[in-house]
From Swiss-Prot:
Name the UniProt record assigns to this protein: Large ribosomal subunit protein bL31
Necessary cofactors: Zn(2+)
Biological processes, Gene Ontology terms: translation
Superkingdom per UniProt: Bacteria
Keyword list, A-Z: Metal-binding, Ribonucleoprotein, Ribosomal protein, RNA-binding, rRNA-binding, Zinc
Binding site for Zn(2+): C16, C18, C36, C39
Length: 73
């Protein structure tokens, strides 16, 4: 393997916007991220279901006849 052609790999602390720090290996000297597993809604279980403009109600109205036919059968 040739010398001096590969970047130097070292341990760094990646810092999230929430303040969480994770130790990683990288060729970068520092890393800042906006979201991590400590603050992401998928991992924290604090997901919110947002019904914008009544999409669920519109769907139910549009397919109400279809669902009624299946219920009768």
């Amino acid at each position: 393997m040739r010398k001096d052609i590969h970047p130097e790999y070292h341990k760094i602390n990646a810092v999230c916007a929430c303040g969480n720090e994770v130790e990683l290996g990288s060729v970068e000297t520092e890393m800042k991220v906006e979201i991590c597993s400590a603050c992401h809604p998928f991992f924290t279980g604090k997901q919110k279901l947002i019904d914008t403009a009544g999409r669920i109600e519109k769907f139910k109205q549009r397919y109400a006849k279809h669902f009624e036919k299946k219920a009768e059968a």
